[in-house]
Amino acid sequence: MGLCKCPKRKVTNLFCFEHRVNVCEHCLVANHAKCIVQSYLQWLQDSDYNPNCRLCNIPLASRETTRLVCYDLFHWACLNERAAQLPRNTAPAGYQCPSCNGPIFPPTNLAGPVASALREKLATVNWARAGLGLPLIDEVVSPEPEPLNTSDFSDWSSFNASSTPGPEEVDSASAAPAFYSQAPRPPASPGRPEQHTVIHMGNPEPLTHAPRKVYDTRDDDRTPGLHGDCDDDKYRRRPALGWLARLLRSRAGSRKRPLTLLQRAGLLLLLGLLGFLALLALMSRLGRAAADSDPNLDPLMNPHIRVGPS
């Protein structure tokens, strides 16, 4: 169990494997829609995760995704295509998760952001509307654009290298008028920003994606005495009396309420009783010490007392 860092501050057992933070279902739908999220216990057992879709083996961040109630994440197009291949008379229990064989349709008594988002997504296709008990609709098939592949641009470098202009072409190009060196550009409309597209045709490199920023809704203006919840500080050994220091710090920082008249009288009575007992103990110790050193109380010093054989 952990505490989510969002303003709701809800206790949750869900853990984002990519950002390594506890997340509630509200943050899961709003800010971690394409992250691998499972229970915190599973992350403790094995923190490795696969960022690709298990149906097409393509990164999840490249396409639209949907999350089932078991928190497994798939591309919506892949899940829709797989479910559409089943017969039309398939029972709702026959639509199962490809990963854990759990139900795709959320239970009717299950409420939450994940279940609500899944119901809204399933309501857009007929095979799911039949399982949800909704009337069928006319589906509009909109082809999803395929992601660009770097192999499409692999032959452009050879084209760029083979099309090097000769000296005669350079001379003829320099002799042309100056206004032919630049293509005329249409005037940009004031209410619409101008868009530019740059294509690098030489030295193709594999596409890489930068890691996404860790989602953290905590305010930047933290209290100077509080420290961030980082991984290095989370698992380090705590001192034995750390709880006592935190308790004293919390009591010293809190505002004390003024004592009532009855509380003041009880406090004075307690202090007076403690002082009287301390005075009795001190006088008893001093009196016993004086009696031990008094020669009049020593029987050997008394002439009227004889010790030994008569």
From Swiss-Prot:
Residues 213-224 have a biased composition (Basic and acidic residues). Residues 145-231 are annotated as: Disordered. GO terms for cellular component: Golgi apparatus; membrane; nucleus. GO terms for molecular function: DNA binding; zinc ion binding. It is a single-pass membrane protein. The chain crosses the membrane at residues 267-287. Residues 148-165 have a biased composition (Polar residues). The keyword 4Fe-4S does not apply. Phosphorylated. It is found in: Golgi apparatus, cis-Golgi network membrane. A zinc finger (RING-type) spans 53-101. Residues 288-310 are lumenal. GO terms for biological process: regulation of DNA-templated transcription; vesicle-mediated transport. Keywords: ER-Golgi transport, Golgi apparatus, Membrane, Metal-binding, Phosphoprotein, Transmembrane, Transmembrane helix, Transport, Zinc, Zinc-finger. It comes from the Eukaryota. Belongs to the ZFPL1 family. Interacts with GOLGA2/GM130. Required for cis-Golgi integrity and efficient ER to Golgi transport. Involved in the maintenance of the integrity of the cis-Golgi, possibly via its interaction with GOLGA2/GM130. The B box-type and RING-type zinc fingers although degenerate play a central role in function of the protein. This is Zinc finger protein-like 1. It comes from Homo sapiens (Human).
